[in-house]
A protein has these predicted regions:
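Residues lining hydrophobic/aromatic ligand-binding pockets adjacent to catalytic sites
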Residues: 1-143
Length: 143
């Protein structure tokens, strides 16, 4: 399985969409616990609409998002706390179900995991893939 990841932290909607199209991504899998954003266009519904305009499917898998205490740890630079908290999140039954959905969706069509952080090293999307798709070929997109 090949899967892309992308963050929208330092980009415009145009650059974001162009990066996805250039990579051949056909589906965005939003793994934010709270799919709202202060960045224009990146909240769930506007994002879904913008993606649809360029022929990219949108799926939100909320249970794969980082819980509030994990987001606080990430903002404070407490990577070990983030890793511990997120590992607990992935042990929840709904996260297990959505992890399987993520793998199925990614196997079906070229897909990109979406979160805020530009750098995947500081984002839970890297933790998710390491835990739930360790053999996947991963390409990080940087719009």
């Amino acid at each position: 399985m090949h899967i892309f990841t992308i963050g929208y932290e330092a980009t415009t909607m145009g650059e974001f969409l162009a990066s996805l199209e250039q990579a051949g991504v056909k589906r965005v899998i939003d793994i934010r616990a709270v799919p709202n954003s202060r960045r224009p266009g990146f909240s769930k519904n506007p994002l879904k609409n913008a993606l649809a305009e360029v022929g990219i499917d949108y799926v939100h898998l909320k249970a794969l998002g980082t819980p509030a205490d994990g987001r606080s740890a990430a903002r404070a630079g407490r990577q070990e706390d983030l890793e511990r908290i997120y590992a607990g999140q992935l042990d929840l039954p709904e996260a297990m179900v959505q992890s399987e959905q993520m793998r199925e969706l990614a196997a079906e069509a070229p897909s990109a995991l979406l979160c805020f952080e530009r750098d995947p090293a500081g984002c839970h999307r890297t933790l998710l893939l390491a835990a739930e798709a360790p053999n996947a070929e991963v390409t990080h997109l940087f719009p």
